């Protein structure tokens, strides 16, 4: 896509994340693009920088989150650690989703995600039945590192 952003109604799992962060008042694409520009060596899977797609790759978002935000427990049974808006990565850099404010009868949160074309709802009770391993649990909050990065844009 010329602007990097997919048309309304289209998207992959990473689009849920940048869309939510953008709607919280941050330009996630600009922050990622700037961090790649300043620290390309940290983004191991990027050979050639392409601002039209880099921010939409799970591996890129995973690297950015590891660098800038707090990490939490990856054990979904530790339900008190999971807050609405938390970001989860699966199988290192294969999938990414957001924790919903909705929970099932056991208290386990739903996920908001673009999983595949057959998916009927974006908000699903799938956390405890997924065959993917949670490899990252992040909470995007405004902190000094984010503040410094935003000022450099």
Predicted features and spans:
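Proteins with a high burden of low-complexity, intrinsically disordered sequence enriched in S/T/G/P/A and R
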Residues: 1-4, 95-98, 118-119, 124-128
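N-terminal capping segments
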Residues: 1-66
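Homeobox/homeodomain signature
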Residues: 2, 18, 51, 72, ...
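Residue-identity detector for threonine
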Residues: 3, 14, 60-63, 74, ...
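Short regulatory "switch" loops immediately downstream of catalytic or recognition motifs
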Residues: 27, 101-103, 140-144
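A structural signal for short, hydrophobic beta-strand segments that form beta-sheets
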Residues: 28-29, 99, 134-136
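...with weaker cross-activation on analogous glycine-rich loops/strands in unrelated enzymes
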Residues: 37-117
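Low-complexity, Gly/Ser/Thr/Pro-rich intrinsically disordered linker/tail segments
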Residues: 107-153
């Amino acid at each position: 896509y010329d602007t990097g952003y997919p048309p309304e109604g289209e998207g992959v799992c990473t689009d849920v994340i940048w869309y939510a962060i953008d709607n919280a008042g941050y330009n996630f694409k600009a922050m990622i693009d700037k961090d790649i520009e300043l620290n390309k060596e940290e983004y191991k899977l990027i050979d050639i920088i392409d601002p039209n797609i880099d921010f939409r790759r799970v591996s890129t978002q995973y690297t950015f989150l590891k660098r800038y935000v707090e990490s939490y427990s990856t054990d979904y049974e530790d339900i008190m650690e999971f807050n609405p808006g938390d970001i989860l990565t699966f199988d290192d850099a294969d999938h990414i989703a957001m924790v919903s404010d909705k929970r099932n009868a056991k208290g386990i949160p739903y996920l908001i995600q673009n999983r595949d074309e057959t998916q009927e709802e974006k908000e699903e009770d799938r956390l405890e039945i997924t065959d993917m391993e949670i490899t990252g649990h992040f909470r995007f909050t405004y902190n000094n590192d984010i503040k410094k990065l935003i000022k450099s844009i």
